[in-house]
Amino acid sequence: MNIIKGNIASPLGFSADGLHAGFKKKKLDFGWIVSEVPANVAGVFTTNKVIAAPLKLTKNSIEKSGKMQAIVVNSGIANSCTGKQGEKDAFKMQQLAANKLQIQPEYVGVASTGVIGKVMPMSILKNGFSKLVKNGNADDFAKAILTTDTHTKTCVVNEEFGSDTVTMAGVAKGSGMIHPNLATMLAFITCDANISSQTLQQALKDVVEVTFNQITVDGDTSTNDMVLVMSNGCTNNNEIKKDSEDYYKFKQMLLYIMTDLAKSIARDGEGASKLIEVTVKGAKESSAARMIAKSVVGSSLVKTAIFGEDPNWGRIIAAAGYAKTYFDINQVDIFIGRIPVLIRSSPVKYDKEEIQEIMSAEEISIQLDLHQGNCEGQAWGCDLSYDYVKINALYTT
């Protein structure tokens, strides 16, 4: 697998555009991804009981056909908790895209991110569509989907499948309200491989479980979380069948892109100064390891300790202890970076200057070994700073 420079339109047969429509004052806020041909599609959506209108519509469209040819996204207004009007507006958004591209409406996915409770202004939406072009600036799409993010999040890879080169690209947004169970967290992945919708859905489901579902910034799950994967078959490779060697290679591509995007989201948490990576090994089951890792990285006390550059392993073991899974508390090792701070649940003396150097870094690695099995899991998050409170206190309602 090769990591390459590119954007969401790097796979064969895809194009994209992003622009300023007027949902925000100045920044780019509207864009789309378009495939030359209908692509097979897979999706996972928020587990929040309050589901935004665009998600409902997109999910229903996917269930009808398993195909998608375009994804249109606005940022600044979430179109969530907007009642019947919100459903009409999401449908209108789908219709306008379909009419402009001359494709079936159910082949258009719609997504929105921003302030909850505001109705979609149709004049701004129509203005956006009047300026969108099929082969526009694909790099601008990554900018157009952002809200409180500080930078774009893109990853592109390719891999040889026999004599064919398959390319996969991913783009995401997310900075706050991040605690997906698949903030707003949106991710879109394009690929030119020949793979069925059913096989694609299984691959996405498996990989989401160990990537996007393992990040947390603030413990809030958005009403608009969505991950979509489109694969249009333009490479003309032999169809990737489930459980084949090619399927394993395809999943590795998906895993790399989604891990990279997940870590980028965690690193870009609102007000964050440090990325936290927690690895739990020696568990009886991978699900238990992931649960403990996410419990640790989601702890407000762990987050504030990391912000204060304090190697407070007591907060780490406490957060592990309230994860909803069993482990033997007397057998745990904890490492912060390369330094052991707890061995078999007994404190270890460490060099304060050495550990202070580790705590001052922009990326903090925490490892727990449960000594109960051979399974492991990871989770990612960020520290909790004064700026997080400031950003969200000032965010519009």
UniProtKB/Swiss-Prot annotation:
Active site residues of this protein: T184 (nucleophile)
Major subcellular location class: cytoplasm
Keyword Hydrolase recorded: no
Lineage: superkingdom: Bacteria
Record note on quaternary structure: Heterotetramer of two alpha and two beta chains.
Function: Catalyzes two activities which are involved in the cyclic version of arginine biosynthesis: the synthesis of N-acetylglutamate from glutamate and acetyl-CoA as the acetyl donor, and of ornithine by transacetylation between N(2)-acetylornithine and glutamate.
The protein, known as: Arginine biosynthesis bifunctional protein ArgJ
Source lineage: Bacteria, Bacillati, Bacillota, Bacilli, Bacillales
Gene: argJ
